[in-house]
Structure formats: C-alpha cells, structure tokens
Design a protein with these regions (language model features):
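A short, Lys/Arg-enriched interface patch at domain edges and termini
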Residues: 1, 50-60
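Major-groove DNA-recognition helix of helix-turn-helix-type DNA-binding domains
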Residues: 18-44
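Intrinsic disorder/low-complexity segments
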Residues: 13-16, 44, 59
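Short, well-ordered alpha-helical scaffold segment located
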Residues: 24, 49-50
Length: 60
C-alpha cells in the first residue's frame, strides 16, 4: 500500500495510510503537525511530511 501512493497524498490517502479518521486527519493538517498545502479547497500532503511525522512519533 505505502509504495502505491505517490509523492503528493490526498486526505483520503493520509487517512488510509495512518489508519485515522477524517477529523483527526484535518486536525493534523490544520495544527501543522503534518505540513501540507491547499489548492483551492483541496488539501495536498507531501509524502515527505508524512514520513517526518511518523519518525517524530516513533522517536518518542
């Protein structure tokens, strides 16, 4: 699954990858815990931002 996702993720792919719900995904983006950007009303999440988030969480 992880290798099938491109370099830019959608909110749905983020949810599937991290096994989280939509509200949690939006909270992570809005708080800046996962760096992302919006094009219009659509969030775009760089895969590297998700990798960094996972590393920070597993390092604790």
């Amino acid at each position: 699954m992880y290798d099938e996702i491109g370099e830019i993720l959608t909110i749905e792919e983020l949810m599937e990858l991290l096994y989280i719900g939509k509200n949690t995904a939006y909270q992570l983006l809005k708080s800046g815990e996962i760096k992302a950007f919006k094009i219009g009303k659509v969030w775009k999440i760089p895969r590297e931002s998700v990798n960094e988030y996972i590393l920070r969480k597993t390092a604790k």
